[in-house]
Amino acid sequence: MTAQNIDGKLISQTVRSEVAARVKARTQAGLRAPGLAVVLVGEDPASQVYVGSKRKACEEVGFVSKSYDLPATATEDELLTLVDQLNEDPEIDGILVQLPLPAGIDSTQVLERITPEKDVDGFHPYNVGRLAQRMPKLRSCTPKGIITLLDRYNIDLRGKHAVVVGASNIVGRPMTLELLLAGCTTTTCHRFTKDLEGHVRQADVVVVAVGKPNFIPGAWIKKGAVVVDVGINRLESGKLVGDVEYDVAKESASFITPVPGGVGPMTVASLIENTMIACEQFHSK
């Protein structure tokens, strides 16, 4: 058995096309296009690449993309003042502050300052809390993108034992909540977990988000399991690999996300979708 690759590039393009059609319908009806504000502090090269791809995706679907690039010397107060201005801007539906922020700026303070109805990253405690209470509005982009991928491949999650490896606020924790909502029995593994191998070997669905190349040996994957690899790691050779030993894992899995081209494109697609939802549901009065 060789796993079927889950094509994140294809599904993300489908999602973007669907959003573009909704934008076109809005503008043809005389309504404004959705607006996304992207805030970058400092000159971190990886952040610049991510921000560039998000801005490009916005423009492709017909959004109004507004860029705010602050120097690395910007203070927390300056950033909070900008967030306050964007919260009040009637043409901005979504506010994205690119992480990580420079030392000296409290990212929790900044993310909590974004009004929940413009929190298109889905990081605000209000939005995470709504997901926990089975009433999601704006959902964390990467977990939402993963659920979209599994849904588009008609993978039924109800009753499955799902194991999430990694417990970050950005992926692991909201992913656990998403899988719970989808009807899974969920286990979250983290740095204090004993017998990680035992947990992974039992999993019908494995989601790995730890940021360590080939962290999960392919031999741990149960026959027929669905493997979602969130990691993207560059080896010294320049090759990009995930957190799961792909070549071995694909021999046992039924479905697997490749790296690159699996989960990554869906994060941006979910951001686009969240901005559309924010515009339609919260700011079209």
Curated annotation (Swiss-Prot):
**Single GO biological process annotation from the record:** purine nucleotide biosynthetic process
- EC nos: 1.5.1.5, 3.5.4.9
Q: Does the keyword tRNA processing apply?
A: no
> Which residues does NADP(+) bind?
166-168, 232
Q: In which pathway does it act?
A: One-carbon metabolism; tetrahydrofolate interconversion
Q: Cellular component per GO?
A: cytosol
Catalyses which reaction(s): (6R)-5,10-methylene-5,6,7,8-tetrahydrofolate + NADP(+) = (6R)-5,10-methenyltetrahydrofolate + NADPH; (6R)-5,10-methenyltetrahydrofolate + H2O = (6R)-10-formyltetrahydrofolate + H(+)
Keyword terms, alphabetized: Amino-acid biosynthesis, Histidine biosynthesis, Hydrolase, Methionine biosynthesis, Multifunctional enzyme, NADP, One-carbon metabolism, Oxidoreductase, Purine biosynthesis
Q: Which GO terms describe its molecular function?
A: methenyltetrahydrofolate cyclohydrolase activity; methylenetetrahydrofolate dehydrogenase (NADP+) activity
Does this entry carry the keyword Hydrolase?
yes
Q: Which Pfam families match?
A: THF_DHG_CYH (PF00763), THF_DHG_CYH_C (PF02882)
UniProt subunit comment:
Homodimer.
What is the similarity comment for this entry? Belongs to the tetrahydrofolate dehydrogenase/cyclohydrolase family.
Q: Which NCBIfam families match?
A: PRK10792.1, PRK14186.1
Functional note: Catalyzes the oxidation of 5,10-methylenetetrahydrofolate to 5,10-methenyltetrahydrofolate and then the hydrolysis of 5,10-methenyltetrahydrofolate to 10-formyltetrahydrofolate.
Q: What protein name does the entry list?
A: Bifunctional protein FolD
Species of origin: Vibrio atlanticus (strain LGP32)
Q: Which gene encodes it?
A: folD
